[in-house]
Every structure is written in C-alpha cells, then in structure tokens.
C-alpha cells in the first residue's frame, strides 16, 4: 500500500504537476487513511470498502475534523482510486457516494466600513515602506485580490489609466478587475519609489532590495498595519472578505460580487456567466465605498 501511495504521489508531482502545497496536503490525508487501514488489518487498497471508509470519516468527525477537511480527504481518496483503477490495481472506489458530515460554516471575519476607512485614511509617511504598504492595503480592499494574486502581480497587469488590473487566480484563470480611485492614487505614489530600487523583475511590490515580496512578508506588513491603526489582528483575506461584504451590502448584486471574487464553483459560475464586464464595472463603481468617483472625475 505504501509503494502504491508513493507511486501515486510521484504521478501527481511529475505528470499532473500539482503544486508542492497541494501534493503535501493530499499525501497527509492519504497517509491518514493508510495508517487507519493498517490498524484495521486492511492489507491492500482493494480491500478498503465504502463501509470501512465511512467508519473512518465518522471517527475523524468525532475527533473534531472539520467538514471541509474531510471533503478534502475524500477528494484525495477519489484521486488515488482513479489512479489505481487506471493502473489495473483496483476495480472500485470506496469514496463513491460518500459525503462529509455537514458542519456549521464559519462566517468570514470582516472589518465594518468605518474600520476599513480608519485603516486606510490615516496619515501616510512619504517614504518607501509607508507608500508601498498603503498601496498594498488599498489594492486588497479596492479589488478583493487573494494574497497569491497580489504577490504574483506584475507591472504589465496594471492599467492605471483605465483603472484596471488583470490577475491570475486559482487554476491559472485570469480575470479583469476595476481598481478604485484611492487605490490608483496609492499605486501612482508607490511606483516611482519602487523604480528607485532597480527591481530584479517586474513585480509590482518589492522589498527595499528590489526583490519581489513573498506571501509571508505581505502578511506581516498587513498585520502590522492592523495593529498600528486598529489595534487588532488583520490578515489579507480579511480585507478580501471586507471588499465582498461591503460591495454586496451596497449593491445587493450577488452575481457581480462572485464574478469579481473569481469564485470557480460551477453552481455559482453558471448564474453569472452571461454578465459582461461593463455591468460588473458599473456595479463596482457605484457601490464600493473606496471606488465612488467624485463629481466631475472622469479619470
């Protein structure tokens, strides 16, 4: 069983080219199943049936595993058995028809509008770190980017003249997002300072040594801003949740918000497939508290 698990993980790495993070998560889940099988004297993957797998899921749920974690584990099992069936090592999938126990969905933490404005409207020092961090905060809240999307952002993805940014989201899917006026202003003040570092690549956000900022560095800068301005813990995804919450509260247009967030769930995607970007931009411009244009501002 261990050899077959190793072979499957190598298949994921070399042929499917899954990310190291995903591979590590799948391996942890499958090793959990393997360990349980060994304790139950199940000597092969072919001997694991739906009743025994259901017992494992129930046991893990009783031990406090979340519904989301169990769904991921079942997904890993299905992937393994798809591989085993293809290789002629098994003729069934014990995860077929199994679903994780339903659990309470935790509501995402958000800032209310007043707290978001408090975070963003404080005085900004005219120096490298302050201008860069302000641009990061504004862009997170303006456009609802994921941390990975902001970290990977390059100069050619920004169009400040038209107030647009193209991001590379999950599954290597691109989407076009509006950039609010306040975020554009913050970026325009940051980019000349960025150029002074003679950056090593086209990253929008770089260190004082000109190197692209990694996820951890950005998390720490956002956390520091939250502690300084709000006296609370703050992380990038809280700004993304706040973006979505405030936009939905103002617009009541769930489909537009889902499109702007880049959610890939087919059940939600099908609802707003036919919405064009102009509609999304109109919803964004009229509803987002940091994007509303001043009268006469056509830029």
Curated annotation (Swiss-Prot):
Family: Belongs to the 'phage' integrase family. XerC subfamily.
Residues in Core-binding (CB) domain copies: 1-85
Assembly notes: Forms a cyclic heterotetrameric complex composed of two molecules of XerC and two molecules of XerD.
Species of the source: Pseudomonas fluorescens
Protein name: Tyrosine recombinase XerC
Any one GO BP annotation for this protein: cell division
UniProt-listed SUPFAM superfamilies: DNA breaking-rejoining enzymes, lambda integrase-like, N-terminal domain
GO MF: DNA binding; tyrosine-based site-specific recombinase activity
NCBIfam families: PRK00283.1 (NF001399), recomb_XerC (TIGR02224)
Matches recorded under InterPro entries: CB, DNA_brk_join_enz, Integrase-like_cat_sf, Integrase_catalytic, Integrase_recombinase_N, Integrase_SAM-like_N, Recomb_XerC, Tyrosine_recombinase_XerC/XerD
Main location: cytoplasm
A UniProt-annotated Pfam family: Phage_integrase
Residue ranges crossing the lipid bilayer per the database entry: none
Domain of life: Bacteria
Cystine pairings recorded for this chain: none
Gene it is expressed from: xerC
């Amino acid at each position: 069983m261990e050899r077959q698990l190793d072979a499957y993980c190598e298949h994921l790495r070399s042929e499917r080219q899954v990310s190291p993070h995903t591979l590590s998560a799948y391996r942890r889940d499958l090793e959990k199943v393997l360990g349980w099988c060994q304790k139950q004297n199940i000597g092969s993957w072919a001997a694991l049936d739906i009743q025994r797998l259901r017992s494992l899921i129930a046991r893990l749920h009783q031990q406090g595993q979340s519904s989301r974690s169990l769904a991921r584990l079942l997904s890993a099992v299905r992937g393994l058995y798809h591989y085993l069936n293809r290789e002629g090592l098994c003729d069934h999938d014990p995860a077929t028809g199994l679903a994780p126990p339903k659990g309470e969905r935790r509501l995402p933490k958000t800032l209310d509008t007043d707290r978001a404005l408090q975070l963003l409207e404080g005085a900004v020092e005219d120096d490298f770190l302050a201008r860069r961090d302000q641009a990061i905060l504004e862009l997170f809240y303006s456009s609802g980017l994921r941390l990975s999307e902001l970290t990977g952002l390059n100069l050619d993805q920004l169009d400040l003249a038209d107030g647009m940014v193209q991001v590379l989201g999950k599954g290597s899917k691109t989407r076009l997002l509006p950039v609010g006026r306040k975020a554009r202003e913050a970026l325009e003040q940051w980019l000349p300072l960025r150029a002074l570092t003679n950056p090593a690549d086209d990253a929008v956000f770089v260190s004082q040594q000109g190197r692209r900022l990694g996820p951890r560095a950005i998390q720490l800068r956002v956390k520091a801003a939250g502690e300084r301005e709000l006296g609370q813990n703050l992380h990038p995804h809280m700004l993304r949740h706040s973006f979505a919450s405030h936009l939905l509260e103002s617009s009541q247009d769930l489909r537009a918000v889902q499109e702007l967030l880049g959610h890939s769930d087919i059940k939600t995607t099908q609802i707003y497939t036919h919405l064009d970007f102009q509609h999304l931009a109109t919803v964004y411009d009229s509803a987002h508290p940091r994007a509303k244009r001043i009268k006469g501002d056509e830029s």
